[in-house]
């Protein structure tokens, strides 16, 4: 039974009232949450005040925290489409470099005679050593590991690298209203209409309007889908700052909107939290689920937001763009390195009367430096996002 400041070790159900739990590591919410009898306490959260008497439901690898760690590790180990392209290029690069090394030796012997055989061997070895597929191979995974890890710190769980790469292409985002833009209000009001039952009102999420503005500023068009009446949908859309909305939307309507937008040439992200969103989530180019939504929605989604702060949406887009930009930056410098260093190692400057040439010793140092520089450049991403 943890005391104040202790981390809970199991996902459990409370057996009595009177505890406040810091769930910021899971939900991103800074304030402790009051736990009553029957409430769930997530493993990895911290007891802020009171005492816990609970019945354990999940321990070890079954807890949400363990699943999050597993998901992040799998995502960091997954390959983005650009990485597959680089891998194919590397398969060609290695035999090409071997051929260049052989041609370097042959050229030295042909133009310099047998006296240049030692120089030919040195030059061929220098070419083999200085050529660095490692830098190209490290360019993508190092940036992805940093980007996905940084996203997890911000409460954005990315299931695979493809989603991170595709998110930067998004120009349209479809969002479900209830549970995404709004949350149920704990205050209950009576409506003064004889035929109307008791209604529970909603409230817009903090920073929802700001998040929509940030998305618009990034060039992303936002559409809101709601099952409400046209009047209610218009009210919430206006409050969130969303220009495009649909009322009385059924699950197939959400799917049809995503398909229509895609047919118009748009790259579409779908954000939802319920079973009724799963069809649209599965169809979208990038699918995003809210952590407090249904398990089905989270299973379908490629990205899960662990926080209710919708600013995580524009942050995720910005993170995707910066990560992919870093990948291409790494690849650019890796190719420039090889384009410059391989001819120098082969002794091409001798054709212009210069004796400068990269020796095998310097080639090994340059090869190591190129790999280290790619890693260090990727680590800059941690402080840029």
Give the ranges of each region predicted by the language model.
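Conserved cytosolic headpiece of P-type ATPases
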Residues: 2-30, 52, 59-67, 71, ...
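Residue-level signature of catalytic and energy-coupling elements of molecular machines
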Residues: 5, 28, 41, 56, ...
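Juxtamembrane helix-loop transition segments at the membrane interface in multi-pass membrane proteins
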Residues: 142-161, 379-385
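Membrane-embedded alpha-helical bundles of multi-pass transporters
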Residues: 150, 185, 218-220, 240, ...
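Transmembrane alpha-helix detector for multi-pass membrane proteins
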Residues: 126-149, 368-371, 376-378
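Cytosolic catalytic headpiece
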Residues: 71, 159-276, 280-286, 318-321
């Amino acid at each position: 039974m943890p005391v104040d400041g202790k981390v809970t070790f199991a996902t459990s159900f409370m057996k009595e009232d009177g505890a406040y739990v810091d769930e910021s590591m899971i939900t991103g919410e800074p304030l402790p949450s009051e736990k009553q009898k029957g409430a769930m306490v997530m493993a990895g959260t911290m007891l802020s005040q009171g005492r816990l008497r609970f019945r354990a439901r999940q321990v070890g690898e079954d807890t949400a925290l363990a699943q999050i760690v597993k998901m992040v590790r799998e995502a960091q180990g997954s390959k983005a489409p650009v990485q597959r392209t680089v891998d194919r290029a590397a398969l060609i690069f290695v035999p090409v470099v071997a051929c260049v090394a052989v041609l370097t030796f042959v050229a030295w012997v042909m133009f310099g005679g047998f006296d240049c055989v030692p120089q030919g061997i040195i030059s061929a070895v220098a070419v083999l050593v200085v050529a660095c597929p490692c830098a190209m191979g490290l360019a993508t995974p190092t940036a992805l590991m940093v980007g996905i890890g940084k996203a997890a710190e911000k409460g954005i769980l990315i299931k695979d690298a493809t989603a991170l790469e595709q998110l930067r292409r998004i120009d349209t985002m479809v969002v479900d209203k209830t549970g995404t833009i709004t949350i149920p209000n704990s205050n209950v009001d009576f409506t003064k209409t004889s035929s109307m039952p008791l209604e529970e009102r909603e409230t817009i999420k903090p920073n929802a309007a700001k998040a929509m503005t940030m998305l618009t500023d990034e060039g992303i068009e936002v559409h809101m889908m709601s099952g409400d009446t046209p009047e209610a949908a218009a009210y919430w859309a206006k409050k969130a700052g969303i220009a495009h909305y649909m009322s009385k939307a059924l699950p197939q309507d959400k799917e049809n909107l995503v398909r229509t937008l895609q047919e118009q040439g748009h790259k579409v992200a779908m954000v939802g939290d319920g079973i009724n969103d799963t069809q649209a989530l599965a169809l979208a180019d990038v699918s995003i689920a809210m952590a407090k939504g249904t398990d089905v929605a989270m299973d379908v989604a490629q990205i899960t937001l662990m926080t209710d702060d919708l600013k995580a949406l524009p942050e995720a887009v910005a993170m995707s763009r910066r990560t992919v930009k870093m990948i291409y930056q790494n690849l650019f410098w890796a190719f420039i390195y090889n384009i410059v260093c391989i001819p120098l190692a082969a002794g091409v400057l001798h054709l212009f009367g210069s004796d400068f040439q990269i020796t095998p010793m310097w080639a090994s140092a340059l090869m190591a430096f190129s790999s280290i520089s790619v890693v260090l450049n990727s680590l800059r991403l941690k402080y840029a996002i």
